[in-house]
Amino acid sequence: MCFSPVLEINMQSESNVTVRDDIDDIDTNMYQPLSYPLSFQVSLTGFLMLEIVLGLGSNLTVLVLYCMKSNLINSVSNIITMNLHVLDVIICVGCIPLTIVILLLSLESNTALICCFHEACVSFASVSTAINVFAITLDRYDISVKPANRILTMGRAVMLMTSIWIFSFFSFLIPFIEVNFFSLQSGNTWANKTLLCVSTSEYYTELGMYYHLLVQIPIFFFTVIVMLITYTKILQALNIRIGTRFSTGQKKKARKKKTISLATHETTDMSQSSGGRNVVFGVRTSVSVIIALRRAVKRHRERRERQKRVFKMSLLIISTFLLCWTPISVLNTTILCLGPSDLLVKLRLCFLVMAYGTTIFHPLLYAFTRQKFQKVLKSKMKKRVVSIVEADPMPNNAVIHNSWIDPKRNKKVTYEDSEIREKCLVPQVVTD
């Protein structure tokens, strides 16, 4: 009986200890340490959300307009460009949201599977973007240098796009193969491995864990080299054509000047003998030659403007691709040489946000700058504005002055009785 109060005290102390342990566990679960600083998370998440909205909206607009106009889908160039826009939509829907999830995860959560999926998406985006840009570069070269004998026919373009998607899917699977995700004997051993995610565990420095970086780096540099060589050849081809045509045009001008002088001499000689008919003939020939010279000058100016436009677009395409994807490619090379660390992983996320910016630039560079696409977009906007104006009539018979709507269209002509009588009496007066 004397041990009963001691037992009660021990039971109370043990219950107090267990309650405190439970409270401590709840506190640690509620306040888990974040993998990144709050300002870092907010800024990068804001940029990524902006890229999702702008990239998804612009690429879907381009795809809808391409599908609505059948004449835009018939060409090989537009099909290859549509393939790039489909890829950008996939990146905006799948890859960028997963990067946001990686940013907002805590350190103590089990992020192995999510990190593996994220690395697979990054590998897919990097490889497929580089290959699609490479295909568009070859198509531009084929159009500019060999317009008569094109290498990329419709069948070859379909085969090229099929191979692009197969290789992109293989690049998506490489991070899973690195961690033995598909092997039956591994069990849950892959779950302890982290692929370039900030965590409490150490990074794996084995080369077999970073084969996906070894695939991304050479494809990027190969695409850059091909772009530089191809666009320089395109510009050289345009210069040669303009120069040769311009020189032949000058020769034609000199010949035409000689013919003008000969024609004037002939007209002066013949005018002394045969009078006014030869003078009229000489004037007609001189006028036709002047018109031909004006047309030649106009064509030369149009070629010069086209050359400047192609040169500017080539610089923009190359510079945007280099600006967006060079930092992350160089950082991947640094990770392969020095090994991963928290600082390098954070920098890699920043550079990945820059790389995702191509989803916004691709529609601006490859779709909205084309004249056919601009015509289709303007026509759709005009029809939309006209339908809105006609569907919502203004009260009190208000008149809407719109430059896109012909004011003379659907205009009813009304005459008063006096005007009708005057118009009916006018022919009778004339006949009388």
Swiss-Prot record:
Membrane topology, from the record: Multi-pass membrane protein
Top-level taxon: Eukaryota
Glycan attachment residues as annotated in the record: 16, 192
Gene Ontology molecular-function annotations: G protein-coupled receptor activity
Induction of synthesis: Decreased expression in heart following aortic banding, a procedure that mimics cardiac hypertrophy produced by high blood pressure.
Biological process according to GO: cell projection organization
Deletion phenotype: No visible phenotype, however mice display increased susceptibility to heart failure under conditions of hemodynamic stress.
Gene Ontology CC: one annotated term: plasma membrane
Compartments in which it is found: Cell membrane
Transmembrane helix among keywords: yes
Residues annotated as transmembrane: 46-66, 86-106, 116-136, 157-177, 209-229, 315-335, 349-369
Pfam families on file: 7tm_1
Record key words, sorted: Cell membrane, Cilium biogenesis/degradation, G-protein coupled receptor, Glycoprotein, Membrane, Receptor, Transducer, Transmembrane, Transmembrane helix
Family affiliation: Belongs to the G-protein coupled receptor 1 family.
Function summary: Orphan G-protein coupled receptor. Seems to act through a G(i)/G(o) mediated pathway. May be involved in ciliogenesis.
Stated name of the protein: G-protein coupled receptor 22
Originating species: Mus musculus
Gene name per UniProt: Gpr22
